[in-house]
From Swiss-Prot:
Recorded name of the encoding gene: dapA
Lineage summary: Bacteria, Bacillati, Cyanobacteriota, Cyanophyceae, Nostocales
Known role: Catalyzes the condensation of (S)-aspartate-beta-semialdehyde [(S)-ASA] and pyruvate to 4-hydroxy-tetrahydrodipicolinate (HTPA).
EC number: 4.3.3.7
Keywords: Amino-acid biosynthesis, Cytoplasm, Diaminopimelate biosynthesis, Lyase, Lysine biosynthesis, Schiff base
Source organism per UniProt: Nostoc punctiforme (strain ATCC 29133 / PCC 73102)
Pathway as given in its UniProt record: Amino-acid biosynthesis; L-lysine biosynthesis via DAP pathway; (S)-tetrahydrodipicolinate from L-aspartate: step 3/4
Amino acids binding pyruvate: T47, V206
Stated name of the protein: 4-hydroxy-tetrahydrodipicolinate synthase
NCBIfam families: dapA
One Pfam family recorded for the sequence: DHDPS
Amino acid sequence: MGDFGNVLTAMITPFKADGSVDYGVAAELAVHLANNGTDTLVMCGTTGESPTLSWDEEYQLFVEVLQSVAGKAKVIAGCGSNSTKEAIAATQKASKIGVHGSLQVVPYYNKPPQAGLEAHFQAIAQACPDLPLLLYNVPGRTGQNLQPETVARLAEVSNIVGIKESTGSIDQASEIRRLTPKEFHIYSGDDYMTLPLLAIGAKGVVSVASHLVGNQLQQMIQAFSAGKIEVARDIHLQLFPLFKALFLTSNPIPVKKALKLQGWEVGSTRPPLCEADLEVSQKLEGVLKELSLI
């Protein structure tokens, strides 16, 4: 259950000039990504600006993207919430649409203890037993770290199939890998950590950079899997400046700027996010030119 491949793109949400969701551009971008290294599209997560999307907008995005990439890529729906009841309702509705899985973020702001976090994910899994769930641990945004021991207990649930691990900690990822069966997939939640996490048994990455270099990320992962460590390392080091540039300010501000520099009409970010300032824009443009991406 729930093989999502190696490169999962945390896809941006395009907006029109009036701030409404541009479903047409979303569908076009999804096809482009599916044709350029992306195995699975992760919709309406952090990079997709889920905090400023309504549930109705999210469901419509799921529908449009599912139709556009049918047979080319899988779709994971971001349905997480800091309300267990709300997360269950959203996940059940997304499941009926036909998504291939759901991303479930650690509940934010209310900071449940580990027992509460475990019960939260257990409840969602039990309410949607046929839908693969991917845990999402990003304590820098949620204020709470999902401990490896908690992850290990959740990994025993048949439809909790993996984790997007975004602590940036080799220690944490190593302990998760040590405590969970190899069938439980660890995905790096940070592009710069992908190669290091592959070394301790990760499956791949939920990537922002794959909007721009999806094929190269596939090549890096496949090279590592084939034992061509130097090739994988060289790709990692070549792309490392891009990995850092895409987080010069709050994600997804830089990646949207990069896509616009490539000619994609993805619009701005919704407030309270804002446009990239001149310094960020110039640094990002320099990296993109250095890598011949614009």
